[in-house]
Amino acid sequence: MNKILVFGMTDNPGGIESVIMNYYRNINRKKIQFDFLCNSQIVAYEDEIKSLGGKIYKITARKDNYFKFKRELRAFMSGNAFKYSAIWVNICSLVNIDYLIFAKKYGITRRIIHCHNSDNDAGFIKSCVHKFNKMRIGKIATDFWSCSEEASPWFFDKTVMQGEAYEIITNAIDVKKYKQNDALRKKYRSEFGLENNIVVGHVGRFHFQKNHKFLIDIFEELVKRNSQYHLLLVGQGELEEEIKNIVKEKGLMKQVSFTGVRMDVENLYQMMDIFVLPSVFEGLGIVALEAQAASLPCL
């Protein structure tokens, strides 16, 4: 059996986490098994991962304690790297490529870097680190994957993109989960008290990238035209309270629902009438694919 060490799972069941789990659920686990190296003490889908046979190893996050992170990562790799035929690192920027550096040092022969974004809102220092690591990633990783052609230049220079080890791996979803279902639509619209509303949906963490402020401004104009519009915001994040305050200031609390993190997002699509994703940047937004699979008009 080939064992793959996977990095990319956090405490948030977001886009990258969904991509990883979609593959994990559908691979032949008699031939390939995933283990997960995480820097979060709470891991999305943890129970499911364990039920599928995967192991989860948790280390300190680099942002919490850099030196402890390096010690724990070194200790893990020195004691476990020999078990793995590959490491698959799923990230949105090249600020932290230590997982690949240590994987190379301790002998993991196949080292996959998988790009999941087309830009980043990092400050000056992190942007400089990203650019520096972009120049050297070609000598650290062995395989260079990207979720889209638009995202690739953010991670890879022309030399990498012209090489045989570069590949576009488009995000995959199980379309059957999102098939239109009138019974679910009726059930969820009833639960939310939205039987007669025009439901505008958005799924994403409350973060600068997702552009919630702009979405609220647009929604305010919609409500002026038709009071039956209702905005459904699915997710959580550091800007959630700020967005709630903006909604309050605009007097829209009755027209906007905040659901928090949901593990039944595929069902929430059923109650929507239109899906909006006004992100400042995306690699290949998996929620947009899911919404289209649910036959929703998407903006």
Show which residues each predicted segment covers.
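Aromatic "clamp/platform" in nucleotide-sugar-dependent glycosyltransferases that forms part
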Residues: C92, V261, V280
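Acidic donor-binding loop of glycosyltransferase active sites
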Residues: Q270-G283, L296-P297
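A short helix/loop element that forms part of the nucleotide-sugar donor recognition site in Leloir-type
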Residues: L73, K179-G193
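N-terminal strand-loop element at the rim of the active site
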Residues: V6-G14, S18, N22-K68, A165-Y166, ...
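A short, active-site helix/loop in glycosyltransferases that binds the activated sugar's phosphate group
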Residues: I140-K179
